[in-house]
Amino acid sequence: MTSRLLETGSTPFIRNTAAQQLADVQKQHPDELFNLLGRILPYLRSKSWDTRAAAAKAIGLIVANADTFDPNQDDGQEIKKAENDDLDVDIKSEEELLSPMDDSLLQLERLDLPSILKYGKRLLGSAGKEYEYSLAAMDPASRLQHQKKTLTSRLGLAGEYIEEDLINDNDLVSKPVVKEEPSFVASREHSIQGTSQPLASPIEPANGEESGLSKRQLNQLKRKNKQSARMGANKVRVVDLSSRRASENVTTPSVATPYPIKSENGEERNGDSKPDYFSLDRSAGDDESKIVSEFKGASVPENPLLQPESTEEGPNPNWPFELMCDILMVDLFDPNWEIRHGAAMALREVIRIQGAGAGRVQGKSRAENDILNRKWLDDLACRLLCVLMLDRFGDYISDNVVAPIRETVGQTLGALLSQLPSRSVISVYKCLYRIIMQTDLGLERPIWEVCHGGMIGLRYLVAVRKDLLIKDSKLMDGVLEAVMKGLGDYDDDVRAVSAATLVPIAEEFVKTRQSTLGTLMTIVWDCLSNLQDDLSASTGSVMDLLAKLCTFQEVLDAMKANAAVNPESSFGKLVPRLYPFLRHTITSVRSAVLRALMTFLQLEGEGTDEWVDGKTVRLIFQNLLVERNEGVLKQSLQVWSELLNSLETRGSFKSESDLLSHIKPLITLSMGPFGVPRYPVPMDASLFIKPSGLPFPSSAAAPARSSPASNTPEGTKGRRRKSEKKEAPPPSAHNVDGHMLQGDIDLVGADTMLRSKIYAARALGQLLFVWDQNQLPSLWQSILEGLNHSASTSQLASAMIVEEYAKLSGPSGRYASTLCENLRPIIEGERPPWYSDIACYLHVARAQCHSLLNTFRDHAHVPGSRLPVLAVIVQGDPEAGPNAFSLSDAEKVIGPDFERLKKGLTPAQRITALQVLNDTRATAESAVNEARNAREQRDLRVRAAAAGALVALSDIPKKPSHIIKGMMDSIKKEENAELQQRSATAITSLVEYYTTSAKRGPVDKVIGNLVKYCCVDTSETPEFHHNAMLEKSILSLRKEEDRRDHPDAAKFEREAKEARIMRRGAKEALEQLAVKFGSELMAKVPNLASLIERPLKEALAADELPANIRDPENELGQEVVDGLSTLRAILPKFHSGLYPWVVDLLPLVVKALQCNLSVIRYAAAKCFATICSVITVEGMTMLVEKVLPMINDALDVHHRQGAVECIYHLIHVMEDGILPYVIFLVVPVLGRMSDSDNEVRLLATTSFATLVKLVPLEAGIPDPPGLSEELLKGRDRERQFMAQMLDVRKVEEFKIPVAIKAELRPYQQEGVNWLAFLNRYNLHGILCDDMGLGKTLQTICIVASDHHMRAEEFARTQKPEVRKLPSLIVCPPSLSGHWQQELKQYAPFLNCVAYVGPPAERSRLQSALPNADIVVTSYDICRNDNEVLNPINWNYCVLDEGHLIKNPKAKATIAVKRLLSNHRLILSGTPIQNNVLELWSLFDFLMPGFLGTEKVFLDRFAKPIAASRFSKSSSKEQEAGALAIEALHKQVLPFLLRRLKEEVLNDLPPKIIQNYYCDPSELQRKLFEDFTKKEQKALQDKVGSTEKADKEHIFQALQYMRRLCNSPALVVKEGHKQYNEVQQYLAAKHSNIRDVAHAPKLSALRDLLIDCGIGVDSPSEGDLSGASYVSPHRALIFCQMKEMLDIVQSEVFNKLLPSVQFLRLDGSVEATRRQDIVNRFNTDPSYDVLLLTTSVGGLGLNLTGADTVIFVEHDWNPQKDIQAMDRAHRIGQKKVVNVYRLITRGTLEEKILNLQRFKIDVASTVVNQQNAGLGTMDTDQLLDLFNLGETAETAEKPSDAAGNEVDMVDIDGNVKEKGKKGWLDDLGELWDDRQYQEEYNLDSFLATMKG
């Protein structure tokens, strides 16, 4: 499964975790290396980027966990590191060491670049031919051989490459089978020169005959083969390729391929690792294979192809990864870009980690191996260079073109260069230099992709081998020359890479090449000025290079030198070249410009700031007004601040002349209003300037909202080129800002508009402060006018500007008094009647009122004279006068006027018009309310901003109520979070102002209100009085239920939203106070401390709560809850100096947890959890010492509830932080999972389910600091317990204290140890050992032991809790005798009562029940006698075959769950039979609530698992299913113990399962066809129905088909529609309906029995008389129906095999007699056969007397068949057990067997052998969770996908025509360019190289 998650994982986290898990498997099982790599390799070829990346990561991690290969390790020399080698190597000695075979490797010195470019096959996105399909159809070894054979040609090294047709005519002619000559497979040595060798010599037709096929037929066959090859191409094949060493000569067999690949049904053809009992697939013909199960003995697995094969001398001497790299190196040249990409990533990982061992061989000297290593790496370098030259694939998805292949190959080359000696690095560099320069490659014209590839290679060379660059001056010069050429290239993508190449070595280059700096800087600046295109890819890279270079003084000196020679090169001329990019359409470019400008502003030196002027100021400010990206906005403000500093330093503020003309428009723009949705107010575009300084044309302000196509000029669809040097028109610099300029709130959003106003206000505040400090003439006039502007947004902006200015200047500013005078009226006076920017709301209200009056006129026929007249102009309009339409007019119309007019209506008018009038009035009322709300919101904003400004100016009157109200209203109601934060800051400043003044003023009241607002949201802070009566419930559970539908959902949602806003504002203010005052918070604001502390001390000082706490007028209870809630809200922001104060409160919080009121416990639990997450050491210590002991308080349920609720919240609040403490919590929570209180139990099981999943992670976590020695000791004890719980093998040995009359096998002793462990910790579990392993015996041992120990304890202490209690065993009726017999045999000292039989018999036994040791009864009796069994307290309650309570609604299940017992145990060989919901029912008996409620379980587990089974399930659904099954498995793991027979019984002979097919008889076929014709239509109509009758009809039809498979006699009876027709048919044949000729299964059964020697005539001669002849085999024959048993008995035994002696066991046999029949069959060998029904004979019985099992019929439920066959295959069986399944070919029976397979897979994944311990998951099991009918390995469909197209829908929603392609079908996936940013980030790549 884990490797499936590489593909299906929906998030990088899941995929990376899967990769990590696979690496862990390798760490723990080093021998799995090649198997793992082989399984991951196919995912490198996936179409999905993420899958390939995850697979490469997995390979990297696995390879890192493998040992480094160094054959000369013992020589005592280290492998020389590439950096340490010397440049001059002794070449002669090397030549001597070369072996002849090295000629086959490519050599850097001899690489023919011109030939490669001239003749090499270009690598595009995909091949575009059937070539790749044909390759996919080959088996892997042949494919590798073919590709290596053609590689030299494809590289262009053997002249022009001509594509050969893989499917040639000879392939289509059948060839005589002759032994082929050996051919080389996968041999690297022959990869270059192998072109002349054919794969296998074509065989001439015998006697020179023609092939017998015409040309037309040949062409037809060829097309057909290509089609099937194409369909095979999508398969992901697990490269579990059989072990064939590459360099060995291997004979390719001519018939069967020995390479097991994934077959269509997802099963591997060489067998599966886990026993799959029912693997049938009709399409593959009959499954004649035998499945040998539980075969013990050393199996010899085939090695994977990736594993080098051993030689006669021993293990293979070569580098272990050589074969894999061979495959990957061939894939580097695959026509499909995805395959090239995956191969390059994998090679990068392998070479990075294991490259030093490549090419080395055991038995050679260190020197020889070093040369072999270099040769091998050189060869790979040559291949990578070839890819860089030939690759032409580019992706135009993001800002830049990304060439994923060239980038990844560049990284691979980087990884390789770190391993290469200097000499080879120089050779690589020389090749790259030639590729970039393209001067000597014989090209007619430069190829930009080739140059781009070379540049990428150079970039990684420079980054990885900086050491060589510093040493070798020629290398540095060459790199510089190449980069300069690249920067001047006509292609902007080449420029981008060139710029990025220089960034890592900028420092070295600047220090060593000062002479070339001037030239370089000229090129870089020219590069920027040439970027006319708005979408130029290289802009950001060039900008970053520029910013980096300009941080060096040497560069600045060079620029100054340039400027001295050429005035055009001065800073003043150069920097303005960046301005056009400030409003570039690409965010990253805008950000890069600001970074560059920031760098220039921070430069020191003469002339560096001459570009800083009024134009710059204006352009940066324009950024603030129109930028929508918050990150760029912040950068712009930083640049603005730096700009003002720079201007001040230069003295630009000494006179106003330069800047004033630029500043005034900015003030006007900042004050400009903006509108509301649908009614925008545009900015004044004429006040903007272009980068050139010219005014901005107003016509271009907004982009028209047209379709994108209309804006796209012709001819832009191809590659962006700069070759045609036409004069491009200058781009529209503000195109990106059109919507902001238009004020288009619908598209931009009001919050974005407000944010830009806030940033503009902050910038202007800074400017005004500097302006006023320089004593310049006042600019305040226009700003103060804004305070009286008709638009609210202008007033808001003006007030914010004043506030920002005041924050810097304080109360002592020059204009402070003037500002205060202008602000006070806003706070104290009336607001204007309306605002112009929301006049639209009033227009809508007027229109609705007008409509209402018209309704009176038109519908109620009220004369116009009686209707009021509405003014046309509304308040807020420019020409509005005193009589304009106002809000009060609107309220009058919908209020008094409406009532007056309604009163005047006649009854008749009322009847006709009232409904319409009421509806129209409601609409009008809604419009009026909306207008009122808009107006109130604007008033609130302006007042809050003015109040904030007054606080900043410290103009606080003696009665500050107006100011406080302005800010507090904003805290309460402001929807915009940023404005609310500003008000919170102002409140904080106000509180600070009062804390420093003599009088505290209103601080306490303000703090009190903030605390109150913080607690207003009932979802966070519950109401005390509303919940005061709850004592014995846990409020956390109630609050989950409260989230139901409310009667008035809209009103509830509105109120909840208001409460959330209020809490957000108050919390923000309190947090800011905590941050501002730090450790002095409680001293400065003692009221806050008192509001938290006082109620807790008052309420909890005594042992009991105050008696009057529940009185409605008593507020103490609410104050306690509020105090705890407030502490929880602001604690994360507390200064650490306040922690001791909080720790002092902890005992009170613990006391609150013990309180008898649910609501206080709830608040305390949440508060305690937060304290633990912030002050972890003290909090957790208190938890362990004080809270956890409460959880076991048997006497006080409130203590237990408080503790468990606290733990529940702790888990949710601390998340990962709880890991070091998990171990402390598990055992206490575990103990409460069987609590008598339902709510404690529910919360404990929910918490435990979360904790148990964290336990495996806990061990690796270091000890948290500050834990006391005592706690650490305690943790070790708990760890021991957890280890025992998770691994049965670690459980302490349990000495059985009673004399059990049996010798326990080791695994049975382990089982008893586990049961004793559960007993000791009061846990409950399921013993689900395989059938026949002795579950009964293990149970008897623990029950008898526990009874004995309780009796001893009682004798010693007389404690009532250990008094004698009976134990109850509930089992199916046929097993009651079996239990009595086993108890008598193994524990005769126990007094056993069998509570079975008829009611009279049972009533006689009732009095004996309480005194018995063991009571055995059946499920039916449990249901019927519930009132007898319920009152008894049982010690153990054991459910044998416990899966019988799988249906939670069945009466027997409900009855069993009512029984009270100390210990609950389920025995079941098959706990999951059909679906996982059954497991929920079992756990609902064991530990109710552990798996959540049934609904929760369904949603979380059952539905995703079921959904993942369907063939059309998406990869998302498959992942959800895989994750759900994994989570469920981990959660139930500690409570199930399962061992399989093949694991523990070495002495058990194998079980062989065979399918025995028989063809339907003529009569059966006829009846099938008639039934199908007549019933099919009716059945199709009913399949989707939910009607009970329809379901029954379908069920009956299925039953009919099943019966017909067995014998026509079961269906053709009187009343059957074709009864007479069939009778005539039989009469004509002289036959009868029961004749075995018509039921082939019966004749097959007879043949089978005779083959087994059953029913054959006894030998006529010899010592034995016929009577005493015993058959060599004895059989169990299972049928589903009793009727079928009758037919077998009468037609086969009585007529055909009369000598067979048989017994019969079915439902007609009384339960009490069944065990006798079993005993007779086991002990008397003269009985040949036992006939059974699966339902009666399939459970629990021991029938080891038989060694043959025959299924005449099959159950839908696979576990019933498995149970049945294991009646014979169990302990005591000495012979091989043969299981035969009789199947009627081509019928419903095959469908049943296919369905069985899925059910078995689910069951074996949730409950598997791991439940014997949490070991490492079996890799095969991790890999395939669901082996369904299709290839589960891939999200793509298998090769016969065309057959699954029924009902598929195409992209337009129409039903797909079969075989027809959709227009999107061939499109690869689209992805997010973040994948590129993450994958191709140079810094992260270098980090991995170091790591």
Curated annotation (Swiss-Prot):
InterPro entries, per database record: ARM-like (IPR011989), ARM-type_fold (IPR016024), Helicase_ATP-bd (IPR014001), Helicase_C-like (IPR001650), Mot1 (IPR044972), Mot1_ATP-bd (IPR044078), Mot1_central_dom (IPR022707), P-loop_NTPase (IPR027417)
HEAT repeat extents: 30-68, 473-511, 569-606, 957-996, 1139-1177, 1181-1216, 1219-1257, 1526-1565
UniProt-annotated binding residues for ATP: D1329, D1330, M1331, G1332, L1333, G1334, K1335, T1336
Biased composition (Basic and acidic residues): 264-275
GO molecular-function term, one example from the UniProt record: helicase activity
Domain named Helicase C-terminal: residues: 1663-1813
Keywords: ATP-binding, DNA-binding, Helicase, Hydrolase, Nucleotide-binding, Nucleus, Repeat, Transcription, Transcription regulation
Renumbered residue ranges of the record's region Disordered: 184-216, 241-283, 295-316, 699-740
GO cellular component, one term: transcription regulator complex
Residue ranges with Low complexity bias: 699-710
Motif DEAH box, residue numbers: 1440-1443
Function field: Regulates transcription in association with TATA binding protein (TBP). Removes TBP from the TATA box via its C-terminal ATPase activity. Both transcription activation and repression require its ATPase activity. Part of the NCT transcriptional regulatory complex that acts as a key regulator of ergosterol biosynthesis and the azole exporter cdr1B. The NCT complex binds the promoters of genes linked to azole susceptibility, and especially represses the expression of cdr1B transporter.
Complex and partners: Forms the NCT transcriptional regulatory complex with nctA and nctB.
Family affiliation: Belongs to the SNF2/RAD54 helicase family.
The protein, known as: TATA-binding protein-associated factor mot1
Gene (name only): mot1
